[in-house]
C-alpha cells in the first residue's frame, strides 16, 4: 500500500494522482496493523510533504510540521531521518523561524547519518546560528560533509579558505566542486536539496572566478574567470549578486 501511495503521488509507473497517493498514506498512518508499523514514519513524512507542497491536499505548513514531528519521532534513528532534516530546514525559514529548534533537528539528523544536515550544522557552527560559534566544530562538520559529497558544504569551505587568504586551497576545492553542474543528478546522488546544491556550486564558481580574475592561488585567466562568474549567476543569481556586492565593496 505504501508503494502504491508513492507511485500515485509521484506518478511512477502510473498516472500521477496525488489525492489517491495521500489517501493511501493516511490509511497507513492510521492503520493498527503490525505490518504497517514500520511504514508509518515514511508515510507521515510523505504526508507532511504533501501538505507543505499543497499537492493532493490543501497547503498547510502547520499540518506539515505536525506530521514531520510524528515522522521524526524525537530523533529516533529508526524513524524518518529525512523528516528530522526537513524539520531543521523548516525551522530556519521565516514563517516558523527558530534557529535553536533548527540546530536541534539538524543535530539529530546528522547523528543518524544525514549528509544534508551535516553540511548545514557546519554552517550553523561557523556563523553561530542557533548555537554558540565554534570554528573547530564547523570545520569538522563541513569537511566531513564535503568528503561525503555535500556540495553546499564544499561551497562554504571555499568561502572559508578564501576569506582567510588560503587562496590555493580555496581554488582547488572550487575547481573540484564546479566540475559537475548537473544539479538534478547531484541531488539524486547525495539526497540533498537541489536549491542548496545550486547555492554550493554558485559559491564555489564565484570564488574560483575571483581567484582567476585576480590571480590568487592560481594563474590569472580572465576568460576562465568570466566563464565561472557566468556559472555562478546562472545557478543562483541571489548568491552571485550578494558576492558581487561584497567584491565591489572590497570585502572579498
Indicate where each model-derived feature is located.
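Canonical positions in the second alpha-helix
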Residues: 28, 71, 108-109, 144-145, ...
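Hydrophobic face of amphipathic alpha-helices that form TPR/SEL1-like repeat modules
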Residues: 3-10, 28, 44-53, 84-93, ...
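Intrinsically disordered, low-complexity repeat tracts enriched in Gly/Pro/Ser/Thr and acidic residues
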Residues: 50, 68, 172, 187-188
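Extended, charged alpha-helical interaction scaffolds
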Residues: 103-104, 112, 116, 152-156, ...
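Structural signature of tandem alpha-helical TPR/SEL1-like repeats
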Residues: 16-24, 59-67, 96-105, 132-141, ...
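Short helix-capping/linker turns of helical repeat alpha-solenoids
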Residues: 1, 10-12, 17, 31-33, ...
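Long amphipathic alpha-helical scaffold regions
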Residues: 19-32, 140-148, 160, 165-186
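Ankyrin-repeat-protein effector appendages
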Residues: 159, 172-183, 210, 214-216, ...
Amino acid at each position: 500500500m505504501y508503494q502504491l501511495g508513492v507511485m500515485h503521488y509521484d506518478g511512477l509507473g502510473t498516472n500521477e494522482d496525488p489525492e489517491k497517493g495521500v489517501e493511501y498514506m493516511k490509511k497507513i498512518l492510521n492503520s493498527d496493523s503490525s505490518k504497517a508499523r514500520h511504514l508509518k514514519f515514511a508515510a507521515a513524512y510523505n504526508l507532511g510533504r504533501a501538505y507543505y507542497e499543497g499537492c493532493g491536499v490543501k497547503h498547510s505548513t502547520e499540518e506539515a510540521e505536525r506530521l514531520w514531528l510524528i515522522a521524526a519521532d524525537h530523533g529516533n534513528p529508526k524513524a524518518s531521518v529525512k523528516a528530522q532534516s526537513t524539520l531543521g530546514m523548516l525551522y530556519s525559514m521565516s514563517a516558523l523561524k527558530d534557529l535553536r529548534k533548527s540546530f536541534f533537528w539538524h543535530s539529530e539528523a546528522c547523528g543518524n547519518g544525514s549528509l544534508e544536515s551535516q553540511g548545514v550544522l557546519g554552517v550553523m557552527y561557523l556563523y553561530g546560528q542557533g548555537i554558540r560559534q565554534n570554528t573547530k566544530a564547523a570545520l569538522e562538520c563541513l569537511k566531513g560533509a564535503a568528503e561525503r559529497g555535500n556540495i553546499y558544504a564544499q561551497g562554504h569551505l571555499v568561502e572559508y579558505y578564501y576569506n582567510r587568504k588560503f587562496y590555493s586551497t580555496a581554488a582547488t576545492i572550487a575547481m573540484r566542486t564546479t566540475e559537475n553542474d548537473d544539479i538534478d543528478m547531484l541531488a539524486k546522488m547525495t539526497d540533498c536539496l537541489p536549491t542548496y546544491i545550486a547555492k554550493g556550486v554558485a559559491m564555489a564558481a564565484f570564488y574560483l572566478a575571483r581567484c582567476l580574475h585576480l590571480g590568487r592561488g592560481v594563474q590569472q585567466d580572465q576568460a576562465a574567470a568570466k566563464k565561472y562568474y557566468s556559472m555562478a549567476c546562472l545557478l543562483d543569481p541571489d548568491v552571485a549578486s550578494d558576492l558581487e556586492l561584497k567584491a565591489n565593496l572590497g570585502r572579498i
